[in-house]
A protein has these predicted regions:
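Active-site-proximal loop and beta-strand segments within enzyme catalytic domains
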Residues: 152-155, 176-273, 290
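Mid-domain, small-residue-enriched loop/turn segments at the edges of structured enzyme/sensor domains
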Residues: 234-332
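Active-site-proximal alpha-helical segments within enzyme catalytic domains
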Residues: 200, 277-287, 317-341, 397-414
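Active-site Gly/Thr loop motif
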Residues: 350-411
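Extracytoplasmic soluble-region selector
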Residues: 22-129
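C-terminal motif of bacterial Sec signal peptides marking the signal peptidase cleavage site
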Residues: 18-20
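A short, well-structured edge-of-sheet supersecondary motif
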Residues: 140-183, 398-402, 406-412
Length: 451
């Protein structure tokens, strides 16, 4: 084709577009506000305690953004239990009875859009007693020893609960076919627990949770539309890549022949649990795209803590990390003490993943948890969800931080991923029981948390 024609084509196209638009302005329709949600979605506060709410908007084009509290009107279903200020701070009444509840909602002043029930915050008044209680450790250990959810089906495993200063209680259950137990120093493939590590890396790279861009948010809570990699726990980016890095992996194709780097318009704005979101984000918005696999873990670890060691078996950002429970716990401790900016990103910009009124495309977790920045929010009321933040992996590695951002926990194991993400979910079913036993000081004897 004639070069002059090729070079003049953009100018001709611009002229035609200008003519069709009347010579000025734009015919693009601005996205409209479709829904707003509050986070944390579950509040467990003692009488007199307060908590700041965050308002997240979802627009018609699938994009999300944090809204300033000044643009919203907040309300409480029971002001005798809890009030909410104009700036979105919830405060429990000093004389509120333990067990009382209230629903906190918000209305966008400009559009009139109001939080649906799933987007509102559910508050329960709890005791102000210190945790751990005198029986927290014994209750956690008894739950591990006696509850079927923590039994032989998920052994061997290591478990731990701690705070920002280190472990408070831990143990190792069972052994593998060689007689070896899982220890705090055992290096494991953590699969999708890599997602929380990457989200923590990105938030630290930006400098704060508030500095996360709308693009960061859409990629990290899996609504970007980059859903063509799948979430296989087997090798996705083979070692035959040259160079062996994220960018090269994205040039591969899925079984349907679609590039990993391709966006699917059908999933833009919809939650779709897929490795493609983080892989493409790392390539487009961070320096990790050209980092070879042998240096990938070191590069991420350097921003998280000088004390930890992370390795990657393949350049799969969302699922390829190997590390010990000891090193993963260090990251969780630094989140809790605020050294890592991820503390303020926990639970923000949550999207729904299940339900009749949820426009999600795919979730591997059978409960309607919400998904935030590289982690789940365990807020299903049918299983007495406590709002903990977690990132279970397909092999069974389950890290969590409780809703109050005071304690962390790990249940570490590595089993073959024949059931997709279900080893991670099985670990979560045990891990949440241990957490609840520790938080309440009461042994958990049922399949879901009670008491």
């Amino acid at each position: 084709m004639n070069n002059k024609i090729v070079r003049s084509w953009p100018l001709l196209l611009s002229a035609l577009l200008a003519a069709s638009c009347g010579g000025g302005g734009s015919s693009a329709i601005a996205p409209t506000l479709e829904s707003i949600t509050l986070s944390p979605s579950i509040l467990r506060l003692a009488p007199g305690a307060s908590e700041q709410l965050t308002v997240t908007a979802t627009h018609s084009d699938g994009s999300t953004a944090v809204l300033p509290p000044s643009s919203e009107t907040f309300s409480s279903s029971n002001v005798n239990v809890a009030s909410v200020s104009a700036s979105g701070v919830v405060t429990v009444a000093a004389n509120a009875a333990i067990g009382n509840t209230a629903t906190i909602s918000a209305t966008d002043t400009a559009s009139g859009v109001t939080t649906a029930s799933a987007g509102s915050a559910q508050l329960t008044v709890t005791t102000a007693g210190a945790v751990p209680t005198a029986t927290s450790v014994s209750a956690a250990k008894a739950t591990v020893a006696n509850n079927a959810q923590c039994g032989a089906d998920i052994m061997p495993y290591y478990w731990e609960i701690g705070d920002q200063n280190g472990p408070l209680v831990s143990g190792s259950q069972g052994a593998d076919s060689t007689g070896a137990p899982v220890l705090v120093t055992t290096k494991l493939a953590v699969a999708s627990a890599s997602k929380l590590l990457y989200a923590t890396y990105v938030t630290q790279l930006r400098g704060s949770a508030a500095a996360l861009t709308s693009q960061d948010t859409n990629f990290l809570h899996f609504t970007s539309g980059y859903s063509n990699m799948g979430d296989s726990s087997g090798p996705v980016c083979p070692q035959t890549l040259d160079p062996d890095d994220v960018n090269s992996c994205l040039q591969l194709r899925n079984p349907q022949g679609v590039l990993f780097s391709a966006q699917d318009p059908a999933t833009v704005g919809r939650f779709y649990y897929d490795s493609g979101h983080m892989e493409n984000h790392a390539s487009q918005f961070t320096p990790l795209g050209t980092v070879i696999v042998g240096s990938l873990g070191k590069t991420i670890a350097a921003l998280l803590s000088p004390k930890i060691s992370i390795a990657f078996g393949e350049p799969l950002i969302s699922g390829g990390a190997f590390l010990s429970s000891q090193d993963y716990a260090t990251v969780l401790q630094r989140i809790l003490d605020g050294t890592l900016a991820m503390r303020n990103a926990l639970g923000i910009n949550p999207v729904c993943t299940h339900g009749a009124n949820c426009n999600a495309a795919f979730s591997p977790i059978p409960e309607p948890w919400h998904y935030s920045i590289g982690h789940w929010v365990e807020d299903d009321p049918l299983t007495n969800g406590d709002g903990a933040f977690s990132s279970p992996g397909a092999f069974g590695f389950y890290p969590w931080i409780d809703a109050s951002k005071t304690f962390y926990g790990i249940l570490a194991r590595a089993q073959s991923p024949e059931n997709g993400e279900q080893h991670g979910y099985a670990s979560a079913q045990c891990g949440r029981l241990i957490r609840h036993a520790f938080m309440t000081g009461v042994e958990q004897t049922q399949p879901i948390p009670t008491n």
